[in-house]
Amino acid sequence: FSIKTKYSELKRAFRMIAPASLSSGMIQINVLTDLFFASKIVGAAAALSYANFLVQAPLGIVSNSILIPLLPVFVSLRSRENNFKLIKKIHQGLILSTSSMIFLGSIFISLSTPIVILIYERGSFNQNAVDVVSQLLIAYGIGMPFYLCRDLLVRVFYGIEDAKTPFRVSTIAILLNLFFDWFLIGGSSPWGELSPLHLGVNGLVFSTTFVNLFACIFLLFELNNKLDNLLL
């Protein structure tokens, strides 16, 4: 009986780990897609890396401080009789993550140029580079709330032992990211004409924002269905 129980628990854990690992790996496909389109613009890949570094450092600190304490709470409240408590914690998490990201995003938007100058402007990193990275930082700031909301909702699904839904969302996100990268970057390239829009490298950041927005909406509706339409 003990061996059978352990095997059952191991099988259940594998059903969670396999889709979750694949979902995490799919994020790198989106990064490679962005770099492919960035290669069509001189200096775009480097600018994306510089701006992304400025975003990921504070984002990682804030996300860990919010998501790590909430995950065990979601797990402990996953039983059906605790739906109302689970929904309350989800609402609290969404409010906290959104408000913190709006605050962080507003800093990036309002202080983008001073931040880039302070961190990067030296040597061959001239004013033109400052302007490009500052614009990217503003674009990242606009989409900040959707980054953490998506990650929070994914943790909720893991907490209720559903890793397949985030996996499906990650799969669809790859296709959406490919389309939005093509549609928003605009201009011409050695590979032919792109879409009529001309957002340039900023379009790659807005593409990520739209993909994260889609993920948030899709996950919210799926979660609402799982919680008997009590979430929304």
Where are these predicted regions, by residue range?
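Interhelical loop/hinge segments that connect adjacent transmembrane helices in multipass membrane
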Residues: 1-27, 225-232
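Membrane-interface junctions at transmembrane-helix termini in multi-pass inner-membrane proteins
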Residues: 142-172, 182-183
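Interfacial segments at transmembrane-helix termini and the short loops linking adjacent helices
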Residues: 109-143, 194-198
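Interfacial/gating helices of multi-pass transporter permease domains
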Residues: 16, 36-59, 127-134
